[in-house]
């Protein structure tokens, strides 16, 4: 009996110890929760905050979101080609007060000098308190509209000319070479079912079938934003025209055939499904890739692929609107083959109308289709053609203004060629959205 009593006493003592321990743990937990709630109430701004922009515009807004999203909700549209993921580095603002310390994700986009000048990425800065920021004044002129698609046809095998109309009565003031942004909603699409084959065109459908593009599918799980250079120039009216290349997955390594199991580009897939009458959200204008108008220097445009867009806008404005005849102007465009070249007739007609404008077509290799059509071209990569046919015997390549937009490898090759000729980097102007 004594032994049993001792066991009961021991068990009771153990339970008492456990109960006391659990009680103390619960009390400590409740105290910590209370401290956190008090800290949140007094240290974290959960109500409205005031954002002072450029010392002359103030907005009162809710806290909690990124500065990029907060500004957009209040009608101030920062550029963000990556949709706020911190990779493009375009949503630059100066944060003079509020915003906390710069994050590692931001530091890669700024020099030490820029960091000392308070430059930040709007997509990485959380709005938690009153802020004082600085932005490019031109950003305040950016507008956002619901636009209507009026045309979306292929102009090359993998490139669409995408045109939308601004709402009635709306107008966008822009300088040729600017770009626009398009909002990409959540969607799920099947290339075979959701892309209108009549808008691809009979000329390009065989290539689409041969490459198996209609077997692709795409899904976007969250809204995002993408940037595209505008191909239109101001005199063409209240519309936005883009040239969009379909971003296919990489091909499988040889001898395999077909695409790798990677989703195609979200933005281009979405745009390729759009039909006349559809509505899209666009904003603009953005960018500083503009011609130098108060100059008499020779101008050379260098493009490839969908990089045609801003170069067409600049060239058409310099000729059709400004009627520039006192500057030598050359446009070198590179493509794999003739069926990848678009707006060819426009530039050939400009040559006839303006003796100071010259169009030069470079095709990667001899092209029987171009030969049969009587189209003048030079075989070779565009940087080689520029050097061999023009700059090699030019008196002063360093005095030319260069405007370039196209695939990365093309740009790198042109940069190297120009550097070998002593051209200063400041004479080379780029558009990063080709």
Residue ranges of each PLM-predicted region?
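Cysteine-centered iron-sulfur cluster-binding motifs in ferredoxin-type domains/subunits
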Residues: 80-89, 122-126
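A short, basic/flexible loop-to-alpha-helix module at the beginning of a structural domain
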Residues: 270, 283-297
């Amino acid at each position: 009996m004594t032994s049993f009593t001792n066991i009961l006493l021991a068990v009771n003592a153990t339970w008492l110890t456990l109960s006391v321990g659990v009680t103390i743990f619960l009390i400590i937990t409740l105290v910590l929760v209370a401290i956190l709630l008090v800290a949140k109430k007094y240290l974290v701004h959960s109500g409205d905050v005031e954002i002072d922009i450029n010392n002359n515009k103030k907005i009162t807004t809710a806290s909690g979101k990124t500065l990029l999203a907060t500004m957009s909700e209040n009608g101030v549209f920062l550029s963000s080609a990556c949709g706020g993921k911190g990779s493009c580095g375009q949503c630059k603002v100066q944060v003079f007060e509020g915003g906390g310390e710069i994050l590692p994700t931001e530091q890669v986009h700024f020099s030490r000098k820029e960091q000392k000048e308070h430059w930040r990425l709007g997509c990485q800065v959380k709005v938690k308190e009153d802020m004082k920021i600085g932005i490019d004044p031109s950003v305040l002129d950016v507008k956002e509209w619901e636009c209507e698609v009026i045309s979306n046809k292929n102009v090359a095998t993998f490139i669409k000319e995408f045109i939308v109309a601004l709402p009635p009565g709306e107008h966008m003031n822009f300088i040729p070479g600017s770009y626009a942004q398009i909002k990409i909603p959540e969607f799920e699409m099947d290339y075979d079912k959701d892309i209108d084959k009549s808008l691809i065109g009979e000329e390009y459908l065989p290539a689409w079938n041969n490459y198996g593009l209609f077997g692709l599918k795409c899904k976007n799980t969250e809204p995002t934003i993408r940037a595209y250079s505008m191909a239109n120039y101001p005199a063409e009216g209240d519309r936005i025209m883009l040239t969009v290349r379909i971003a296919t997955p990489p091909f499988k390594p040889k001898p395999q055939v077909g695409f790798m199991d990677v989703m195609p580009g979200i933005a281009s897939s979405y745009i390729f499904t759009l039909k006349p009458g559809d509505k899209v959200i666009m904003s603009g204008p953005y960018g500083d890739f503009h011609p130098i108008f108060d100059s008499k220097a020779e101008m050379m445009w260098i493009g490839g692929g969908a990089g045609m867009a801003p170069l067409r806008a600049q060239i058409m404005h310099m000729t059709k609107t400004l009627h520039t005849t006192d500057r030598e102007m050359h446009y070198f465009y590179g493509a794999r083959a003739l069926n990848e070249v678009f707006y060819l007739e426009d530039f050939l007609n400009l040559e006839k109308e303006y003796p100071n404008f010259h169009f030069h077509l470079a095709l990667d290799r001899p092209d029987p289709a171009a030969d049969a059509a009587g189209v003048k071209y030079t075989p070779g990569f565009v940087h080689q053609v520029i050097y061999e046919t023009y700059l090699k015997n030019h008196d002063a390549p360093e005095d030319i203004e260069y405007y370039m937009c196209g695939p990365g490898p093309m740009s790198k090759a042109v940069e190297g060629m120009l550097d070998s000729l002593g051209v200063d980097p400041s004479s080379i102007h780029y558009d990063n959205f080709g």
